[in-house]
Amino acid sequence: MKMLFTIFGWLIAVIFLILSALCLWAGNWIPAIPLILAAVLLIPPLREKLSARLGISLPFWPRLVLIPVLFMLSVYLIFAGMGNKDSIYKNADIESRLMSIYDARMETFPVPYKSRYIDTKYGKVHVIISGPEDGPPILLLHASAMSSWSWLYNIKELNSKYRTYAIDTIGDAGKSVLSNIEVYPADGPSLAALYEEIMDSLDVASAYFIGASQGGYISSNVALYAPERVNGLILCGPMGYTGTNASVFRILLTTMFPIPPLQNSATRWAFGDDPAINAVVSDWFGAILEGVISRQARPAPFSKDQINKIDMPVLLLLGSRDGLVGNPEDTEVLAENFPDARVHVLDTGHLISAEKPDRFNSLVMDFIENRKE
């Protein structure tokens, strides 16, 4: 039994040393100190030298308590170093990098547009408005860790007939700004109320909603709690229709240790292997992993009863290789509870609208044209 404990201790020590090396590689040396100390306590020769140097004994039970305490201290120091009590951004440099990338992406936006800021109870919400002024309205709600520039693959086709309002999610990276980072729409009813407030400011009585990932979760909540504002839903790899995918811990690991190999791996895993897509999202996503702690509602799974209440037309688009949402078959089964839904599974990862823009645009335009009231 003692040998078993020793082997297990060595394995945990190796893990701690690897984690401390990742901290040092990321330039975050303070959290590495408790990890190294915990590893020393787990390795008998090093522990004996430490005990002799300090002139104290280190019995088993105190060590058993001290080691997890040191580990938790390291985790706390990692996240404390990322935090900023006044902003979702770790520091001004991260924010500046992201805004520069945002502006550069908007230089490639294929249609004329105007930006508008709307004052809400949570802060300023940034909206990109484009398309014919007399066109039927569509609200575009982007995926988490993206922003409204991500619709650049679809906007030209949509604006051929429709007026679009691409909204930067408040509390996420982008040009919307929370007044207080501790006060944000954290549940379905508050999300619906916020988007009603935005629509009132835009003088939009009702609209089709196109929501990707977290944007799909937000759109679904507006449909649930303010159904009169939603003409129809286009949901692209939406959150809230399956349980939390265990692989999201990969994102957490990369956030804790933002080194290039982990960042590149996380980008490919989240957005697929398409080099063109990775070239567009990698610098943006890398900066987010390095220094953004978003403040937004966590997508709890919708119940079958809730889905059944979404009785407006729904177009559900799923990616067969989506590493974030998970198995599309599970979502398809749950989608059977929609009273009026079409479901399509595309050969894509998570960013359906960017990976297969022509197919996405065709499905969306056909859906709206055939469902007009």
Task: Name each region found by the language model.
Residues 75-136, 162, 205, 369-373:
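Alpha/beta-hydrolase fold catalytic core
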Residues 318-348, 354:
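Conserved loop-alpha-helix segment in the C-terminal half of the alpha/beta-hydrolase fold
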Residues 310, 316-318:
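Short beta-strand/loop motif that positions the catalytic acidic residue
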Residues 290-306:
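Active-site nucleophile elbow and catalytic-triad environment of alpha/beta-hydrolase enzymes
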Residues 217-225, 232-259:
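Flexible "cap/lid" loop of the alpha/beta hydrolase fold
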Residues 129-174:
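Conserved HGGG/HGGXW glycine-rich cap/lid loop of the alpha/beta-hydrolase fold
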Residues 341-373:
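Catalytic active-site module of serine/aspartate enzymes centered on a nucleophile-bearing elbow/loop
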